[in-house]
Amino acid sequence: NPKGIDFYNRVIDKCLQENIEPWLTCYHWDMPQVLEAKGGWTNREMLKWFDEYVTVLAKNFGDCVKNSMVINEPLSFTLGGYMAGVHPPGTISFKNFYSSIHHVTMAQSIGGRAIRAHVPNANIGTTFSCMPVDGWKNKPANLKAAKRLDVVANRMFIEPVLGMGY
């Protein structure tokens, strides 16, 4: 929306005037309701919509913003929104959780490519929330459970971005 672009151009200009390095965060849990009504991150079409959106951001802000975070804390909004039900859309579903993980992981790559296409020298990344995971009392069953938790909590989004697959 042009008013939103104008607003953020003013914010970026003010940051630069004050010698503050602006950073662009493409997605920070703010799904438009019209897209959520179509399934949000559970809908594969979200990848096309996200590509178009990030392209608009890169074209409009890339001349002034060189640092971009494609997605902020993907585990928080996928787990919280699609599995635990504590963040929008507030559902509890393994199917929705896993499809959202897959689409968000792909969106990180798609968003990075969209930025790179318009801002070749951009610094591009994603903000991950991680946690230490240990097996209680080093018991085999606890160590096995800790390993599974580590995959979900720490590796699920990071390893694909690093080219290590799922």
Report residues per predicted region.
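Non-catalytic scaffold segments within catalytic domains of secreted glycoside hydrolases
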Residues: 1-166
